[in-house]
Design a protein with these regions (language model features):
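AMP-binding/adenylate-forming core of the ANL superfamily
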Residues: 185-213, 223-224, 278
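AMP-binding/adenylate-forming catalytic core of the ANL superfamily
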Residues: 209-297
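AMP-binding/adenylate-forming
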Residues: 33-40, 56-112
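AMP-binding/adenylate-forming catalytic domain of the ANL superfamily
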Residues: 294-316
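Gly/Ser/Thr-rich phosphate-binding loop
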Residues: 116-172
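Active-site glycine-centered loops adjacent to acidic/histidine catalytic or metal-binding residues
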Residues: 106, 133, 156, 210, ...
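Conserved pre-ATP/AMP-binding loop-to-beta segment of ANL
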Residues: 3-20, 53-56
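Conserved AMP-binding A3 loop
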Residues: 16-43, 50-52
Length: 322
């Protein structure tokens, strides 16, 4: 979808607009969402970051998904001067680009940009950079820490019309815990999954598939949260519950080749964890796992795959990985 096509849809008489989920947990699903709630979401983000009319913004993500659409809506809501570039893994490659007040990228775009000195300099001139659409790896987090500008990780999904919480990745306010926006209530259900009550962007409370931990900020009294992993990424293996994201986080500093953990039905164990990797040295991978992971976290199988399956937005596509 082009920006002109989106704007034509935005300015028509229909109070709703069609969006699609990213497909990280299955086939992308269409959703009809209210334009007024998208404007509410845009206003909340712009207020949080202190964006003002005339500030500059960069659109470098596809308009097929909510993240790209919301960048346009924020520019409309706050009268930002929006520059569009073709979505790519190097969004700041053009040396003629101006400095920006605000931009949103996925982790892969930030990682690739920071690897190129000239592009890194341009990224450092973005006053507020928000990163969403995937996990922040340990390596990327370390690359972000020394940056002088404000860099944030977002939490949200298509159903919440982009993000409902941010956490700072660098500077004195850096944290592992997300701070919800004003007007957003959070709680846990009986399964330990995050429940979001954000009436300005969602008509009903939303029960997520994200297993979370809550705590109260001593300074502000706000309830903060940390995501441990997805409920559907729990492997129930021989009576032991294994959170896939926690296994991957533990292994990431030790494995240089791309990898992911998936699960598969097993007659004896119920389910078993399998490590997929682009490396061909499976013996070495298994040795690292046995030396690094708790005994019951060690995958039961190790398989080579030429290219790990990813969604269009760069998230692991675990469903149907075989």
């Amino acid at each position: 979808m082009t920006k002109d096509e989106f704007l034509a849809e935005w300015h028509n008489d229909n109070p709703r607009i069609l969006v699609h989920t990213s497909g990280s947990t299955g086939k992308p699903k269409p959703l009809m969402v209210e334009k007024r709630r998208m404007l509410n979401s845009a206003r909340i983000t712009c207020d949080f970051l202190g964006l003002k009319p005339g500030d500059t913004a960069l659109l470098c993500m596809p308009l097929d998904y909510i993240a790209g659409k919301m960048m346009v809506v924020r520019s409309l809501q706050r009268d930002l001067r929006l520059t569009s570039v073709r979505p790519s893994s190097h969004p700041l490659a053009d040396e003629t680009l101006p400095s920006f007040t605000f931009a949103a990228m996925v982790p892969m775009q930030v990682y690739n940009t920071l690897k190129v000195p000239q592009e890194r300099e341009r990224l450092m001139r973005i006053r507020h950079l928000i990163i969403g659409g995937g996990a922040i790896s340990d390596e990327l987090a370390q690359m972000i820490k020394p940056l002088p500008n404000a860099v944030w990780s977002t939490y949200g999904m298509t159903e919440t019309l982009s993000h409902i919480a941010l956490r700072r990745l660098n500077g004195p306010d850096a944290s592992l815990w997300y701070t919800p926006f004003d007007g957003v209530g959070i709680s846990l259900n009986a399964d330990g999954c995050l429940v979001i009550d954000a009436p300005e962007v969602c008509a009903e409370p939303l029960v997520t598939n994200d297993i979370a931990q809550l705590r109260t900020d001593d300074r502000t009294g706000k309830t903060l949260f940390r995501i441990k992993g997805r409920k559907d990424n729990v492997v129930c293996s021989g009576g032991i519950k294994i959170q896939i994201e926690e296994v991957e986080e533990t292994l990431r500093p030790h494995l240089s080749e791309p990898f992911m953990i998936v699960k598969k039905q097993d007659e004896m164990l119920g389910e078993k964890a399998i490590l997929l990797t682009e490396s061909t040295d499976l013996t070495h991978i298994e040795e690292i796992c046995r030396n690094t992971l708790p005994k019951y976290w060690v995958p039961r199988e190790f398989l080579h795959i030429d290219h790990l399956p990813l969604t269009e937005t760069g998230k692991p596509k675990r469903s149907g990985a075989f």
